[in-house]
Amino acid sequence: MKLTCVVIVAVLFLTVWTFATADDSGNGLEKLFSNAHHEMKNPEASKLNERCLDAGEVCDIFFPTCCGYCILLFCA
């Protein structure tokens, strides 16, 4: 019985601690939904429209956009 109470208190404390130390807990969902709304109005802004490069195409080492891996400037 005592162990159960201690566990409940610990979980409640950790939950409160998580919400109290969150960086942007008040505006997080609002920003998420406004970005999603912007992407619906402007489909080009969506990251899902970016095409990955097939094997054998030239890729960039620093910003690879390959479907697989970027090895020696070519997608694998």
Curated annotation (Swiss-Prot):
GO CC list: extracellular region; host cell presynaptic membrane
Domain of life of the organism encoding this protein: Eukaryota
Keyword flag Transmembrane helix: no
The keyword DNA-binding appears for this protein: no
UniProt keywords, alphabetically: Calcium channel impairing toxin, Disulfide bond, Ion channel impairing toxin, Knottin, Neurotoxin, Presynaptic neurotoxin, Secreted, Signal, Toxin, Voltage-gated calcium channel impairing toxin
Range of residues in the leader sequence: 1-22
UniProt note on tissues of expression: Expressed by the venom duct.
Matching PROSITE patterns: OMEGA_CONOTOXIN
Pfam family, one: Conotoxin
Disulfide bonds: C52-C67, C59-C70, C66-C75
Compartments it resides in: Secreted
A molecular-function term among this protein's GO annotations: calcium channel regulator activity
Propeptide: 23-50
Domains: entry comment: The presence of a 'disulfide through disulfide knot' structurally defines this protein as a knottin. The cysteine framework is VI/VII (C-C-CC-C-C).
Function: Omega-conotoxins act at presynaptic membranes, they bind and block voltage-gated calcium channels (Cav).
Family: Belongs to the conotoxin O1 superfamily.
Protein name, UniProt field: Omega-conotoxin-like TxO1
Protein species of origin: Conus textile
Organism placement in taxonomy: Eukaryota, Metazoa, Spiralia, Lophotrochozoa, Mollusca
